[in-house]
Amino acid sequence: MTSEIILQAIVTGLMMGLIYALIAAGLSLIFGLMEIVNFAHGEHLMLSMFSSFWLWSLFGLDPIFSIPITILLMAFCGIITHYFLIRYILKAKMLIQICATFGLSIFIRSIAQLLWTPDFRNVDKPLLEGRLEIGSVFIGQPQLVASLVCLVAFIGLYLFVTKTETGLALQATAQDRHAAEILGIPSNKMFAIGWAIGLGCVGIAGGMMANYFFIFTDVGINFALFAFVAVALGGFGSIIGCLYAGVIIGLVESLGGLLIDPSFKLLYVFAIYLLVVIYRPQGLFGRY
């Protein structure tokens, strides 16, 4: 095995890791804010990919140009999810919250299968296609642009949460919602904003991946699983931890499949998850 092949795997892992990081950041933001795990995160990613596909199929809008629309659609979906479901289970037991979001995932997937069937779809001849050759490394243009857009979005999210007034209000609500309400911060509004931003993240990731991934009703399952691992690895509620965790997962998946056995790629990732849960349950970075 040559060093060029290993370098190719590293580059591929880094690009996928940045996408995993943004997906996980949306999940982590929601959990850190409300301590509710969104088990429908993968289905929301699937909806974002289908949104890009149908905007291309019906209106000829290339996925890279439909990203703003996809973000708005998914943010609206997050607000609807909060006001019509989540706010009613905020004070419920954890088991009820898990069943509610898990049931939401089944509902969304079932509706998608009814409307669109489980067939595989793809965007034919997108604006981004082809590959770049840098030395001995080949980089697909759609993958490169998707990873860079996700990185920029991640940085924007982190700066928003840590530097803006609304972001600081989100952090205050996450730390102590009752104290935040005493200070005049409307927790219900913050929760809705958190859901909008969290699903906006999957809107960006899903919209970019629609350029080169097959789109089908179960497409979000593996991405959601990796997002859960990234959140656990980086620290529940830690946004910056998702970046490092996403990159680690991408590299483990890529290098593990190359150096050991590609059929066990998922095993390597979940082995890391188990080790983290057992030996460092708070994750590498803790909250925020």
How does the language model describe each region?
Residues M1-L22, S51, D62-S66, A92-C99, ...:
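Membrane-interfacial amphipathic/re-entrant helices at transmembrane-helix boundaries
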Residues I5, L115, D119, Q175-K189, ...:
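Cytosolic-side transmembrane-helix boundaries in multi-pass membrane proteins
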Residues V11, L33-I80, F84:
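Membrane-embedded helix boundary and interhelical linker motif in transport proteins
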Residues M16-G17, F138-F216, I239-Y244:
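Helix-loop-helix "hairpin" substructures at the membrane interface of multi-pass membrane proteins
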Residues Y20-L22, G60-L72, W195-Y273:
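Transmembrane alpha-helical segments in multi-pass inner-membrane proteins
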Residues L27-M49, P63, K91-I96, T166-A169, ...:
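Short, non-helical or kinked segments that cap or interrupt transmembrane helices
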Residues F59, Y88-K163, M190-I193, L255, ...:
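Transmembrane helix-bundle core of multi-pass membrane transporters
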Residues G60-L104, I111, Y244-I249, R280-P281:
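Alpha-helical transmembrane segments within multi-pass membrane transporters and channels
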